[in-house]
Amino acid sequence: MCIRDSCQCGRSRKHSIEELRKKIYDIIWEEQLQRGVAAEISQALMEEVYTTPKPGLVDREDTGAHTDMDCQTFQKSTEAIAEDLAAMFEAGYSWEADPETLFPLLRERGKKTEEKMFAATGGVNTHQGIIFTIGILAAAAGISLRNYGKIESESVCRISLEMTKKELEQDLRKLKQSSGITHGEKIYCHLGEKGVRGLAMTGYPILCELTVPHMKQYIANNRDKNQINVQILLEIIAELTDTNVISRTSEKEMRWLQTEAKAILKAGGAFSENGLQKVRELNQICIRKNMSPGGAADLLAATIFLCRMETLMERRKGILQ
């Protein structure tokens, strides 16, 4: 608790019982923190997968537009990467320098995490986008907890911007001089859509301004958890320029999917039987078109993660009071 010898402190009764109690809880909390974060990440990733129905995506009813993965594939992948993503939170929590100096280290760790994912899934890309997005958000959450003693989506998104903006802007400048390697990079070179890089370097406004506030409101209104997740997914699809959809189909088809999501929301969304039936009908169309809004699914998982982290902090506050 202080730099003095513990025996001297004990004899002098320098620290109150309440101070000692709080310090003990802090030590226990820090020891359990990474395990707790890993559990929250696992829950967020699998909660997204099990959300049903979803258009073109793997869920409990079918595998959407995918023939190489199912719920079990995602379970294996989640088990392989959750601890690594939690370690990125720990890296942020222990980082003392500027956030932007942490990002190159996160990217290197992310490559190793991708290798674990591919090893677990037999080469299937289940969570590449998640590793990038949750890795950044987890590290930013760690920095937020260290610097401000709390985790709130607004501060996490702001720190994400501070952490990534400079390096990702450099990435995009270099990409302009090439034809791109990944699907997302090729789309940026041809269409100028920045994809996951653009979301990170602008501080994930869709999360902190739209999906997290909406999810918290739906939870406060005691809505069904699965329906909340379907609703949030529809809201994301309606707003996001999803490069996953573009890479599998075209920009025109992605705009069509946005329009369909908006129409379902207008018809009552996931909180109506009619809306859920329309999602199932849209799923069948997406399967025929080989269309999968994977970028939107990643942001649903990110939304769940941020809400769960805020709840985790509330539980911590309750323990310390």
Q: Model-derived features: where do they sit?
A:
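Conserved phosphate/anionic-ligand binding catalytic regions in large, soluble enzymes, centered on
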Residues: 121-138, 290-305
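Active-site cofactor/substrate anionic-group-binding motifs, chiefly glycine-
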Residues: 101-102, 106-121, 125
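Phosphate-rich cofactor/ligand-interacting catalytic cores and adjacent structured alpha/beta frameworks
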Residues: 7, 17-107, 141-284, 288, ...
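Conserved small/polar residues in nucleotide/adenosyl-binding loops
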Residues: 1-6
